[in-house]
Curated annotation (Swiss-Prot):
This is Phosphopentomutase. Gene3D superfamilies: Alkaline Phosphatase, subunit A, Phosphopentomutase. Its EC number is 5.4.2.7. It comes from the Bacteria. HAMAP family: Phosphopentomut (MF_00740). Isomerase that catalyzes the conversion of deoxy-ribose 1-phosphate (dRib-1-P) and ribose 1-phosphate (Rib-1-P) to deoxy-ribose 5-phosphate (dRib-5-P) and ribose 5-phosphate (Rib-5-P), respectively. It comes from Clostridium kluyveri (strain ATCC 8527 / DSM 555 / NBRC 12016 / NCIMB 10680 / K1). Pfam families: Metalloenzyme. The gene is deoB. The keyword Manganese applies. Mn(2+) 1 binds at residues 10, 323-324. Belongs to the phosphopentomutase family. GO terms for cellular component: cytosol.
Amino acid sequence: MERVILIVFDSVGIGELPDAKEYGDVGSNTLGNISKAAGGLEIPTLYKLGIGNIQGVENLRRCEKPIGSFGKCAELSKGKDTVTGHWEMAGIVLKTPLNTYPQGFPEDIIEEFQVKIGRKVLGNKVASGTEIINELGKEHVDTGYPIVYTSADSVFQVAAHEKIIPVEELYKMCKIAREMLLGDRTVGRVIARPFIYDKGKYVRTSNRKDFALDPPGKTMLDYIKEVGLDVMAVGKIEDIYNKRGITEAVHIKNNMDGIDKTLGYMKKNKSGLIFANLVDFDMLYGHRNDTEGYAKALVEADKRIPEIISNMNEEDVLIITADHGCDPTTKSTDHSREYIPVLVYGKNLKAGVDIGIRKSYSDIGKTILELLDIKNNLQGIGFKDLINK
């Protein structure tokens, strides 16, 4: 029985899609532009896997004899957010994008929310969660008004001090928002963000809770779970799929912790899917236009990939990909509409195969089900036949 380890390098796109102009993303090339700005990236394992051999990539080193197969996927869904990218990867193509609110939420949404929770709100803008609680934390404590904010993703986030608005009450507020934000107002996730005051600043607690949406159809994860195999989720995967199709999940502190948790599941689990998201690239560096920090994070992650490879069994398959772009070298702090890389490695697979330019992220999910010999009606065109010996 094969086991697949699927790792999403969140936001590590590799070049603008043909429709990038519609999204204001002409010129975006997250990995290529970071490499150019850094004067080259020391990511030897990704090069060995073939990332520099993908058609059309720029500023990346080619490998004469890559140990992996390589290619890239376009996004069929409308949008460029986390949920849309991950859902398509698992076989769900969205014809209508989930709503994002780069200018904050419209007055009618905020007014309705305020009436329903019986309080005014603070914020209502795009913000970093750690920064906005320190910007507005004192005012929140003084007034009792919760802090509402969003991000480049389709999210409605509500932050409150645990002693001002108890956690259960905050959860009730988020349930109200979840019921409101459907139909033409749909957002992918409503997130409760409790915090406290500690050592001179406001810090988030572990009582975060996501009120997500079920994917609108059967996903790769559902198919795997239905046949009795494990689906182990690392990072925010559990939240993206609203816990559906997942047998066990663990949240993480950062990229390195995410790799540690992935290795832990590899030692514990012997079949099915281990599905990890490494979010630091996007959250800490992409949105903050921190090109140098992004480059360092890529180098750090690359150094850990050999650990994953050395812990793989004979039949294991490793797939490294992304979910969208977030080019820190552009003026925008938003996600970018880009191709995503697909790197595939397994001891029993062919090496050096160019799987080409794929039409949809869903080809990844389709291929995983083929590798696990699971019959399915998932959207996408699998490439198992190209990489199988």
